[in-house]
Amino acid sequence: MREIVHLQAGQCGNQIGAKFWEVISDEHGIDPTGAYHGDSDLQLERINVYYNEATGGKYVPRAVLVDLEPGTMDSVRSGPFGQIFRPDNFVFGQSGAGNNWAKGHYTEGAELVDSVLDVVRKEAESCDCLQGFQLTHSLGGGTGSGMGTLLISKIREEYPDRIMNTFSVVPSPKVSDTVVEPYNATLSVHQLVENTDETYCIDNEALYDICFRTLKLTTPTYGDLNHLVSATMSGVTTCLRFPGQLNADLRKLAVNMVPFPRLHFFMPGFAPLTSRGSQQYRALTVPELTQQMFDAKNMMAACDPRHGRYLTVAAIFRGRMSMKEVDEQMLNVQNKNSSYFVEWIPNNVKTAVCDIPPRGLKMSATFIGNSTAIQELFKRISEQFTAMFRRKAFLHWYTGEGMDEMEFTEAESNMNDLVSEYQQYQDATAEEEGEFEEGEEEENA
């Protein structure tokens, strides 16, 4: 079987990671002790992708949990599925990274990284044919962003031909923990551009807006945001965990989704959107799902896809439904909105259907888009970065850990290059100039 080793780093990474394991364990019929109580062969057919089978028929997640302080990992361990993880796979320091990327990447994190790699190596060795790694982390803090990107580059060094996939939570002023988030995020993106094969941008701004506007939650908690993240992560990994044809492994997904190596930042979406504890039981139709899934309001990245064009799209439908109807609806979307799909990649929308719906829903749809509109997210971070960096605000926290200002300048220009590359492919051979007036102004800015 083609196995995936999962890593989670930092507070955010461990919280969404723990939630991910709760959701997929439930979908595969695995209880908190690792025992199987399922009702369908489909649940076990590809169980080896994410789980090791241990003695006594117990299933153990191929997960490595990393943090620079013990707090979050203690709560994961005492949480609902805390006992399912292999105890040796908790690797933590005591000092904390204090939301400082340099501490995670160069000082504190660098001291812990070798013990993490030992655990990763052990997990990789127990694999029959490792396809790659996935990391859950945030880009705003110190550990997930600094040490997370350090782990990525170390794993890249040791396993250069394996796919590296990240679920990266992008900071937002609306849900902010620290003032230095733009620094940490920019330094991280600088690493992700070079060292990952696919990155799902999960944007706190979008999650917050969904909770607030769509789900009508007046004060969204991290629990509410994480509920959305886990639904999305469960959706985008469906093809990897259940038998099927399309995008059945990380490499095939990358081949379908990434036309240019640097442009691998995906915008995930999910339909129907439900709040925690109130899954609606109203029956959805395939046309409704399709329409919702392409709607800007359902995107987990705060970018409007109508401001850009899709290079590629993958859609995953879950539940019992007619394949024919799904194909018709997907074609319908493309024909009606053809100007939003680049014409120089024909057949750039791929669809998969899985019979098993997520818990509490009859059917659902997950969207993975590689859209040039994702540049809005990088622009947003870049503007915040520049505002502080111009005044060298808070810089001493980073230089004190041995960083150089030059590194900030490089990261800033790499992220700005990324924005220009997205813009370049958005404008490529576009006859219909009308829609791209915004585009030209940004080029000159």
UniProtKB/Swiss-Prot annotation:
Q: Where is the composition biased (Acidic residues)?
A: 429-445
Q: Which GO terms describe its cellular component?
A: cytoplasm; microtubule
Binding of Mg(2+): at which residues?
E69
Q: Which residues carry this modification: 5-glutamyl polyglutamate?
A: E438
Modification after translation, per record? Some glutamate residues at the C-terminus are polyglycylated, resulting in polyglycine chains on the gamma-carboxyl group. Glycylation is mainly limited to tubulin incorporated into axonemes (cilia and flagella) whereas glutamylation is prevalent in neuronal cells, centrioles, axonemes, and the mitotic spindle. Both modifications can coexist on the same protein on adjacent residues, and lowering polyglycylation levels increases polyglutamylation, and reciprocally. The precise function of polyglycylation is still unclear.
Residue numbers binding GTP: Q11, E69, S138, G142, T143, G144, N204, N226
Any notes on this protein's domains? Answer: The MREI motif is common among all beta-tubulin isoforms and may be critical for tubulin autoregulation.
The entry's protein name is: Tubulin beta-4 chain
The record lists the organism as Xenopus laevis (African clawed frog)
Its gene? Answer: tubb4
